[in-house]
From Swiss-Prot:
Substrate binds at residues 77-79, 96-97. The gene is queF. GO terms for biological process: queuosine biosynthetic process; tRNA modification. Keywords: Cytoplasm, NADP, Oxidoreductase, Queuosine biosynthesis. Gene3D superfamilies: 3.30.1130.10. GO terms for cellular component: cytoplasm. The active site is at residues 55, 62. It is an enzyme of class 1 (oxidoreductase). Its EC number is 1.7.1.13. InterPro entries: GTP-CH-I_C/QueF, NADPH_dep_7-cyano-7-deazaG_red, QueF, QueF_type1. It catalyses: 7-aminomethyl-7-carbaguanine + 2 NADP(+) = 7-cyano-7-deazaguanine + 2 NADPH + 3 H(+). The keyword NADP applies. This is NADPH-dependent 7-cyano-7-deazaguanine reductase. GO terms for molecular function: preQ1 synthase activity.
């Protein structure tokens, strides 16, 4: 059940030896491919331990591990494009909470998943660690209720 060339059209970054790293926020770099199992509900999880953004006030770097979990529908995010997209935040000035919500919204726009959650585990600055959590469940489905439930239980992980 290998993927054929036609199914891989639109994937341009994976395997490209001349990778160009974006110098600014670049949601357009995200690429998607078809989910071969849209009738199965399953989680895909990414752990991204090298996320960096800038404080919008001081310009100082902020570091985080970003956790992305989603239940795909028709489309899935290609991992190298996700890596480059997350790298594009390196020179982007935004608060931790904004970064997590932007990542979630960009991935929703790309994939239209059944469910998605993004959790940012930012390293402490000034003695305070900020851990924003954002999620979404497709309206009118069981995943809308899942999102509500997970929102209030996410700290129990």
């Amino acid at each position: 059940m290998s993927r054929n060339t036609e199914e891989l059209q639109g994937i341009s970054l994976l395997g490209n030896q001349k990778t160009r790293y974006p110098t600014g926020y670049a949601p357009e770099i995200l690429e998607a491919f078809d989910n071969k199992h849209p009738d199965n509900d399953y989680f895909v999880k990414f752990v991204c331990p090298e996320f960096t953004s800038l404080c919008p006030m001081t310009g100082q770097p902020d570091f985080a591990t970003i956790y992305i979990r989603y239940i795909p529908h028709i489309k899935m995010v290609e991992s190298k494009s996700l890596k480059l997209y997350l790298f594009s935040f390196r020179n982007h000035g935004d608060f931790h909470e904004d970064c997590v919500n932007i990542i979630m919204k960009d991935l929703i726009a790309l994939m239209d998943p059944k469910y998605i959650e993004v959790f940012g585990e930012f390293t402490p600055r000034g003695g305070i660690a900020i851990h924003p959590f954002a999620n979404y469940g497709k309206a009118g489905t069981e995943f809308e209720a899942l999102a509500r439930k997970r929102l209030f239980e996410h700290d129990a992980q």
